[in-house]
Amino acid sequence: MGLSISFLSIIMMMCLLFPDLNVVVKSATTEYTTLIYKGCARQQFSDPSGLYSQALSAMFGSLVSQSTKTRFYKTTTGTSTTTITGLFQCRGDLSNHDCYNCVSRLPVLSDKLCGKTIASRVQLSGCYLLYEVSGFSQISGMEMLFKTCGKNNIAGTGFEERRDTAFGVMQNGVVSGHGFYATTYESVYVLGQCEGDVGDTDCSGCVKNALEKAQVECGSSISGQIYLHKCFIAYSYYPNGVPRRSSSSSSSSSSSSSGSSNSDPSTSTGATGKTVAIIVGGAAGVGFLVICLLFAKNLMRKKHDDY
């Protein structure tokens, strides 16, 4: 009976010592795993033999596996009658570890949000995945898939001039950055990225198109995101200055993501969360070790008393 009470006490002690550990760890990933949008084909694929499901599962496995090594990967799987092409891409400032954490969520989300459709695209804040069954109708790389604009507007303050200058800097930056660029100009943070297999010239054209859409669609809104089929851009204005953050991105290069990345206001909370998670996790490990030693000591004492 004493042993059971001791074990229960240990469990209660762990709950009291680390009640927010799970919350802290989650906060470290939410900045790149938030769902932005989904795109699902209306047609479900007919799969009486299960070949499509097998091909899709194999493709998902391949994409998730590659996300530990690179931020962009495209593959084709299946047979001549069940060909499926799929790809993933992570935001250019994510480390390989964060890229994997982001991409590994996408297969389940795709199945949950779209089911067994002949084409699917799921975009999170840090990565996206898409697949198409052979023969699916193609769309223009300039096609707008999704947009979101901030609710606050600041017309007449010189914001639009600063934003447009930042846009110009970013358009040039994605070329020198070979598909990814992020920077800050006079309190305006901008980020642009093209799909990994898009050349520099086409990338510049796609980003230019997205920036023009942002000017029209979002007007004087202090923030906005425009997602085209082959690229996306995002911007945020901070009147009091863009918050600083410590860099958590990997320095390793990838086929799709390189170039400059300055302070990203959208990830400042996430970077802090990671740091806190590491500290709290370390403390939890030490605390758990101490508790295990105490438990072992009590166990040995009980055995000694029994004799």
Curated annotation (Swiss-Prot):
It is a single-pass type I membrane protein. InterPro entries: Cell2Cell_Antifungal (IPR051378), GNK2 (IPR002902), GNK2_sf (IPR038408). Residues 246-268 have a biased composition (Low complexity). Disulfide bonds join C40-C114, C90-C99, C102-C127, C149-C218, C194-C203, C206-C231. GO terms for cellular component: plasma membrane; plasmodesma. The keyword Repeat applies. One of its GO terms (biological process) is transport of virus in multicellular host. Residues 276-296 are annotated as: Necessary and sufficient for plasmodesmal targeting. This is Plasmodesmata-located protein 2.
